[in-house]
Amino acid sequence: MAKQLLFNEEARKSLLAGVEQISNAVKVTLGPKGRNVLIDKSFGAPTVTKDGVSVAREVELENKFENMGAQLLKEVATKTNDVAGDGTTTATVLAYSMVKEGLKAVAAGMTPLELKRGIDKAVAIAVEDIQKNSKEIKGSEEVAHVASVSANNDAEIGKIIADAIAKVGKDGVIDVGEAQTMETVTDYVEGMQFDRGYISSYFVTDRDRMETVFENPYILIYDKSISTMKDLLPLLEQVAQSGRPLLIIAEDVEGEALATLVVNSLRGALKTCAVKAPGFGDRRKEMLEDIAVLTGGQVVSEELGFKLEAAQISMLGQAKSIKIDKDNTMIIDGAGKSKDIKDRVTQIKAQLDATDSEYDSEKLRERLAKLSGGVAVIKIGAVTEVEMKEKKHRVEDALSATRAAIEEGIVAGGGLAMIQAIAALEKADMSSLTEDEKVGFKIVKRALEEPIRQIAENAGLDGAVIAEKAKEKKGVGFDAAKMEWTDMVKAGIIDPAKVTRSALQNAASIASLLLTTECAITDIPEKQAGPAMPSPDMGGMGMY
């Protein structure tokens, strides 16, 4: 397909036009008085959101060159969301300011590469200042403040998230789902849960709830399929003598073995239940080992030199109770030693630090949570589906922001941390910089004012005036919700340092790319074919 090209100033102007459009759509959502954006869908009701990345993802411009600029800015929001889970609107606003001021400098004859170097050096100093000023998050109250600020000053959401984290711990899994009622509730799962249910409904002990519940069971953990009874019989006889129930976790239980277990369960001779092992491939082996550590048992595996027919009762795991339905198995209060569990958690954390894969990271975090904290499910309730989706977006943002705050600490919110970083740039030694690099510093200084300007403008005030006052008032920021100057940290208006840092770094990265662009190439749009001419012998068709 033929291509069209734009060069120099013309290319950069087209890219800027695209960046500006996406920035204008996103920036209206910033701050406590930010507005919603309504997004049309090809089916169903439109989506209402205040989430910057959700808005950015929907933007697709008709002009191909402008669309390239828009897609680059979309990358800022997406990357910030991936790294920190929040701060996407701030990142977008910062990037637009850097691109706009940077392109003015390029048009005035500055060297793009030197501007880029200046921007990179300034951002490094600002990031260092943000990290230096960050404070470790302490107590549920500060967790609630971070969450409520991210959820558009919704104190109820802040409290729900703070309570969930207090219950499952900072490594615990917190899932966000949809409730069937108008009320938002949190369900807690103590112990380990995995998504495999009973193989046969004949194992059910509670017919009303269709659940299998065992108290003080033994747990056999086996990494292969069981199809014949002779391999399992020696172990079953040992368990039967103890009078305790048995849960079998294996790759599969089928044929003669399954039939015999079902018959024994129905007769009451031996309470048993069989479930398939969670996960697949190597991940399955790791998860079986996790279950073994949690329950104080041993994975019966020929790879480790253990055969099923030679398995002893001492190899079995134990728990206070287990609950199994058709989809899930929950092991409550496993008998594993706390030292072994702690060592296993440390091992998984090391794997988490070493992996680059987002998918692997997610699965490792899930395993970590199952071992160390348990699971909380926040079920979002609302009057309408549109409201529920909007609220769910805010809860997910708040949850991500809270995790980021626990990880890297908190800084003053409302754009104040960035205003304070300007002071660090003004104190920096610029004697070794070229004139163009100094302009790069000025571009970053101007961009750091932009979040507080936009928050003020969304509250109906003059952003430039508020930004100047914030620079004069040391350590005091503007609370746009109450329209007053206050100590932001004491007032609970705080942002995660990771969110602020990531927003600035990602904005600078994309801005630098745009400033150093000299040519843009895209496909020539295909011309739309006109409507077909009617056939001359069909003139009377459709006439009455």
UniProtKB/Swiss-Prot annotation:
InterPro entries: Chaperonin_Cpn60_CS, Cpn60/GroEL, Cpn60/GroEL/TCP-1, GroEL-like_apical_dom_sf, GROEL-like_equatorial_sf, TCP-1-like_intermed_sf
One protein family per Pfam: Cpn60_TCP1
Keyword Nucleus annotated: no
Positions of ATP binding: 29-32, 50, 86-90, 414, 479-481, 495
E.C. numbers: 5.6.1.7
GO BP term, example: protein refolding
GO cellular component, one term: cytoplasm
Keywords for this protein: ATP-binding, Chaperone, Cytoplasm, Isomerase, Nucleotide-binding
Subcellular location: Cytoplasm
SUPFAM superfamilies tied to this protein: GroEL apical domain-like, GroEL equatorial domain-like, GroEL-intermediate domain like
Assembly and binders: Forms a cylinder of 14 subunits composed of two heptameric rings stacked back-to-back. Interacts with the co-chaperonin GroES.
Family, similarity comment: Belongs to the chaperonin (HSP60) family.
Name listed for the protein in its UniProt record: Chaperonin GroEL
Lineage: Bacteria, Pseudomonadati, Spirochaetota, Spirochaetia, Spirochaetales
